[in-house]
Amino acid sequence: METLERVVDQRYDASKWECIIVDNNSSDDTRAKVEAVIAENKELNIHYVFEPKQGLSHARNCGIANSKGDIIAFVDDDEDVVLDLVRRYVELFDQHPEAMAAGGRVQPDYLSGKPKWMSHIVAKPISNPLYYGDYIKPFPRGTHPGGGNMAVRRMIFDKLGCFDTELGRSGDKLIGGEECDFFERMAKVGFPIYYVPRAMVYHRIGDEKLTEEYTSRLFYEVGVSQRIRAQRKKNGLFKAYVSEIGKWGATLLLCLTYRPSQSRYLLKLRSGISKGLFGK
């Protein structure tokens, strides 16, 4: 509930925004806790919605369907958001009417400290860090917002559809890529996506996401996600295979510059992705 506590404390006119909380088929006391927060903050437009279909994409699509605003922002339940998050996104879309989507900075918060084996490449699938400087600008070519800190104009979902429910984490399954798929659709038709550094979240990373077992499953399913998305494109698998082979060369070169523990995890990452991509 830490994320919700930060959301209800947003420094922005409560009459101008709403908060949709999607309970993705939980079996614990989530609903009771949320209803307690709603009762304590009656001045806010907070709404609880239950989504029985398990999966992050189902949950996000449910949030879209139950929201009313022209701009829809998304955060996950393992994040601490800055108190100006809503205001920063509203200002961005007001000042840049050409922007169709936006994303902010994501700063990892390793609850037990950052592991010595964590390199910036290995961190990407684990903690999803995102930083492109301190100024508002279009996202660099080939990049896009992180799923846990993004905002999209409703009209884009009307035009392009919502998040692909074949992708996205679901229960113990760690397949991701739903936001990659969505923003690739946006980029294909040329819709501008902006980076908003001060719309920032801190992504909490507990010890359970740093274990050998978890990271092995995560890296493999990153590859599975890449395979699913590649299969949908003309010559997509061939291009993905060629790209992956090239990444092995870069990986081996990087290992020469890393400390042993970092090299081991970098090789583990590459091996896991390759197995998932090639269907091994």
Give the location of each predicted region.
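Short, well-formed alpha-helical segments that are part of the catalytic scaffolds
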Residues: 1-10
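Glycine-rich, basic loop-to-helix element that forms the pyrophosphate-binding segment
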Residues: 3, 51-67
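A conserved acidic beta->alpha catalytic loop
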Residues: 23-32, 79
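Short aromatic/hydrophobic "clamp" motif used to bind/position activated sugar donors
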Residues: 72
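Conserved donor NDP-sugar-binding/catalytic core segment of glycosyltransferases
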Residues: 84-118
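Short, flexible, basic/aromatic active-site loop/helix in glycosyltransferases
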Residues: 104, 122-143
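A short, conserved alpha-helix in the catalytic core of glycosyltransferases
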Residues: 147-160, 166-199
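Non-catalytic, C-terminal membrane-associated alpha-helical segments of glycosyltransferases
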Residues: 217-225, 231-280
